[in-house]
Amino acid sequence: MKHYSIQPANLEFNAEGTPVSRDFDDVYFSNDNGLEETRYVFLGGNQLEARFPEHPHPLFVVAESGFGTGLNFLTLWQAFDQFREAHPQAQLQRLHFISFEKFPLTRADLALAHQHWPELAPWAEQLQAQWPMPLPGCHRLLLDEGRVTLDLWFGDINELISQLDDSLNQKVDAWFLDGFAPAKNPDMWTQNLFNAMARLARPGGTLATFTSAGFVRRGLQEAGFTMQKRKGFGRKREMLCGVMEQTLPLPCSTPWFNRTGSSKREVAIIGGGIASALLSLALLRRGWQVTLYCADEAPALGASGNRQGALYPLLSKHDEALNRFFSNGFTFARRLYDSLPVKFDHDWCGVTQLGWDEKSQHKIAQMLSMDLPEELAVAVEANAVEQITGVTTNCSGITYPQGGWLCPAELTRNVLELAQQQGLQIYYQYQLQDLSRKDDCWLLTFAGDQQATHSVVVLANGHQISRFSQTSSLPVYSVAGQVSHIPTTPELAKLKQVLCYDGYLTPQNPANQHHCIGASYHRGSEETAYSEDNQQQNRQRLIDCFPHAQWAKTVDVSKKEARCGVRCATRDHLPMVGNVPDYEATLVEYASLAEQKDKAVSAPVFDDLFMFAALGSRGLCSAPLCAEILAAQMSDEPIPMDASTLAALNPNRLWVRKLLKGKAVKAG
């Protein structure tokens, strides 16, 4: 069985207050002067002080083999801030740090270790505030208002490094080869790791490590680095430095899931909901010129316009990609929402998913068998549900303590206002009718025959995404739904958490003393007119799930207050994020894919045309990470997700899976 929790570091603090690993019998940093050793070995060994001012790109990427206490990262971050202060006009604007850690420290141990370096406190406090829960995979932390990105990969580096997406190939400007000493932790120091370091290193990229072990030097040379010895720090006689002086060939094992970015930095986004808003911010942070075209007279009038939406992960014991995406997507969403400098109604009150019948009880039992971190999800017995939710249900379930609700409409509007302050241009009442290539650009034709030309286009227009010739064959479908707005009652006012059953019910929003209950589900429908049947069904589902709960019967839908919207979904419940695939070319190029995988060309796509769609009913959870993934892809930067999970988000995935099995593919 796959486990979804990472074992924390087993450590103690010695007489000097230095953390020591019990498993590896080694210190995390020098008892003498760990901070100065880091500056000498890793910053000095990679010549970063001299390289930063001359770096020809806006982003500098550093990768590290063992995060530990984060000393190397914090020291580098401090040095980067000092560089930016001294060279505000330099080409280099942002720092991206990628690190791997098999046994992450707890937040408490991290804070205790950081007390060693009071001069690093301003940076350490930001790291501690965003420290992720122990879930496997990549955790992206956006620090210093996005100027510093930290990708923490939790798990065994020799397993993780083989799962990385090709977006990391030849991207690393400097390697920090760190970790417990080779004699203490030989399993990490492998030729597999050295080869991967060479594959990820940019031509001209460097490495530094504290060790001078002969097998390490020879292994790095075999991988392709030119190595040399340097005087070690303090009492250590020697250390190693290296440079990647060649350009290594980069074979691709799954070209059908290749992701291509763009060399351009000007884009039009088609949409007006949470996907468009968060993508705009992510691209602006990377220096893009962004224009948004919204078909409506205001933002968030589509599926993102609800008063309250629940935030919690979608989990399934039988779908590893779905678990990885939604669990890490959920934690990223919480970090992003907490860091946004905008106001929106929300309450991280927790979400409890109840086993109201035999099928739902079985589903919850399967989720709980996955060894999830308690910070993510925990079992709750029937007699404890009332204590944490405030209402009686007579059901057991699973609770997500960091979940809650937020107002999607307010979030979307205010994020777009923030993006406008950063340079976003918005045009309302622009209904896109057609897009076509013209002189290496996209010609957009809107209702009323208005036209505009843009270098790059992203389609983030919800259920309307398949209205164009380039997207008409996509396997997505519409789902119409109605959310009821109900006034609170003395009984309903006791509800302290979001309840999920065969529907959902939110606690009251103090701003309007109303709850949201929903939602009806009509696959294939785009109906947005109020339905009295849907209104009554929303109420009846609650009563049917909790027939003995008197509070449920106080729900009043008679005022006919509701909101109707249309979602875009896929049959595998995952979003579609990436290049818009060329359906006709895919069928031609991959006609014999099942027999000729080794001859496959890169996935056929439309140049500089991207999509961000099919968020279904979990857009609040998935949109933040999807926006970050797509912005990174478009900008040709490291993507915060492993290759197999990224493949599960690829818009061509449903076609390719069939073609790989030699099965026929149909449009839609």
UniProtKB/Swiss-Prot annotation:
It is found in: Cytoplasm. GO terms for biological process: methylation; tRNA wobble uridine modification. Its EC number is 2.1.1.61, 1.5.-.-. InterPro entries: FAD-dep_OxRdtase (IPR006076), FAD/NAD-bd_sf (IPR036188), MnmC-like_methylTransf (IPR008471), SAM-dependent_MTases_sf (IPR029063), tRNA_MAMT_biosynth_bifunc_MnmC (IPR023032), tRNA_MNMC2 (IPR047785), tRNA_S-uridine_synth_MnmC_C (IPR017610). The keyword Ion transport does not apply. One of its GO terms (cellular component) is cytoplasm. Residues 1-245 are annotated as: tRNA (mnm(5)s(2)U34)-methyltransferase. Keywords: Cytoplasm, FAD, Flavoprotein, Methyltransferase, Multifunctional enzyme, Oxidoreductase, S-adenosyl-L-methionine, Transferase, tRNA processing. It comes from the Bacteria. Its cofactor is FAD. Residues 270-668 are annotated as: FAD-dependent cmnm(5)s(2)U34 oxidoreductase. One of its GO terms (molecular function) is oxidoreductase activity, acting on the CH-NH group of donors. Signal peptide: none annotated. It catalyses: 5-aminomethyl-2-thiouridine(34) in tRNA + S-adenosyl-L-methionine = 5-methylaminomethyl-2-thiouridine(34) in tRNA + S-adenosyl-L-homocysteine + H(+). Catalyzes the last two steps in the biosynthesis of 5-methylaminomethyl-2-thiouridine (mnm(5)s(2)U) at the wobble position (U34) in tRNA. Catalyzes the FAD-dependent demodification of cmnm(5)s(2)U34 to nm(5)s(2)U34, followed by the transfer of a methyl group from S-adenosyl-L-methionine to nm(5)s(2)U34, to form mnm(5)s(2)U34. In the N-terminal section; belongs to the methyltransferase superfamily. tRNA (mnm(5)s(2)U34)-methyltransferase family. In the C-terminal section; belongs to the DAO family. This is tRNA 5-methylaminomethyl-2-thiouridine biosynthesis bifunctional protein MnmC. It comes from Escherichia coli O157:H7.
